[in-house]
């Protein structure tokens, strides 16, 4: 091993680390473009469970949406209740 090999080896980047870095960039980009947070499906499921304690509804009867307007976030909840 000569002196030049020593300096070249430190600059070598493994393909795994390059792939990992690229994947992290892609994931961050995808998360930034998503309009709904990760917790909305779980929130919708829990809301359906709570409402079912009092009213007979299906999981399709509850719609949850999150809307961003400037610096405010608005959580919209639409529940279709059955006729009495």
UniProtKB/Swiss-Prot annotation:
Would you kindly state one Gene Ontology biological process term found in this protein's UniProt entry?
regulation of division septum assembly
The protein's matches in InterPro entries, at most eight in alphabetical order, are given as: MinE (IPR005527), MinE_sf (IPR036707)
**Which key words tag this protein in UniProt?**
Cell cycle, Cell division
Family matches, as SUPFAM superfamilies: Cell division protein MinE topological specificity domain
| Family annotation (Pfam families) | MinE
What Gene3D superfamilies does this protein's entry cite?
A: Cell division topological specificity factor MinE
The superkingdom of the source organism is: Bacteria
Q: Which family does it belong to?
A: Belongs to the MinE family.
What does the protein in this record do? Prevents the cell division inhibition by proteins MinC and MinD at internal division sites while permitting inhibition at polar sites. This ensures cell division at the proper site by restricting the formation of a division septum at the midpoint of the long axis of the cell.
Q: Which HAMAP family match?
A: MinE
Q: What is this protein called?
A: Cell division topological specificity factor
* Organism of provenance: Pseudomonas fluorescens (strain ATCC BAA-477 / NRRL B-23932 / Pf-5)
Instruction: Tell me the lineage of the source organism.
Output: Bacteria, Pseudomonadati, Pseudomonadota, Gammaproteobacteria, Pseudomonadales
């Amino acid at each position: 091993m000569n002196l030049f090999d020593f300096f070249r080896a430190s600059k070598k980047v493994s393909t795994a680390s390059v792939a990992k870095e690229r994947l992290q960039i892609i994931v961050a980009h995808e998360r930034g473009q998503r309009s709904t947070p990760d917790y909305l499906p779980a929130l919708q499921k829990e809301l359906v469970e709570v409402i079912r304690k009092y009213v007979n509804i299906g999981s399709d009867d509850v719609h949850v949406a999150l809307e961003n307007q400037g610096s405010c976030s608005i959580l919209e909840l639409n529940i279709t209740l059955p006729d009495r």
